[in-house]
């Protein structure tokens, strides 16, 4: 059986076409209230690392072969995963400061809120970095084009790859 260009093979190639970005940042949480006559505040900083993975949704990938022309319909890259690496968190990851009588210690509730803030902050940073999406899509294109050309080389056909959007 000679190799042929297959959409299912392209989808598996494309699953590898993700871009991983590592983040290291700090999120801050402020909590202020009045206890009797005193203003109190709690401040919590969380230092965290996280990983964002970008790539192409392979279910939206399509292809048409017309002679030696292969037209690949590929959507824009998107965030496949974006999360704070929980293993990067330790006692030393949390810095707190309390002022005022009755402010109390920073507890699990504040730590959970700070973690959620870190997660949201990282998601926003990734969403606003257009360069990452361009790099992820370009990487997917390169992998798919190499796949098509390798199949062509194996069967003695020089394929021309064209790109389209859904």
PLM feature segments, named:
Residues 1-166:
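Domain-level marker for long, solvent-exposed, non-transmembrane regions
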């Amino acid at each position: 059986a000679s190799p042929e260009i297959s959409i299912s093979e392209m989808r598996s190639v494309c699953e590898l076409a993700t871009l991983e970005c590592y983040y290291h940042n700090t999120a801050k949480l402020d909590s202020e209230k009045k206890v009797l006559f005193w203003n109190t505040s709690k401040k919590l900083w969380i230092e965290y690392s996280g990983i964002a993975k970008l790539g192409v949704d392979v279910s939206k990938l399509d292809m048409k072969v017309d002679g030696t022309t292969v037209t690949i319909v590929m959507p824009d890259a998107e965030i496949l995963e974006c999360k704070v690496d929980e293993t990067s968190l330790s006692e030393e990851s949390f810095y707190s400061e309390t002022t005022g009588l009755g402010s109390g210690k920073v507890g699990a509730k504040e730590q959970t809120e700070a973690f959620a803030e870190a997660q949201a902050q990282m998601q926003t940073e990734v969403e606003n970095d257009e360069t990452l999406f361009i790099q992820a899509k370009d990487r997917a294109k390169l992998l798919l084009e190499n796949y098509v050309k390798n199949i062509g080389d194996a069967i003695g056909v020089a394929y021309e790859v064209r790109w389209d959007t859904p």
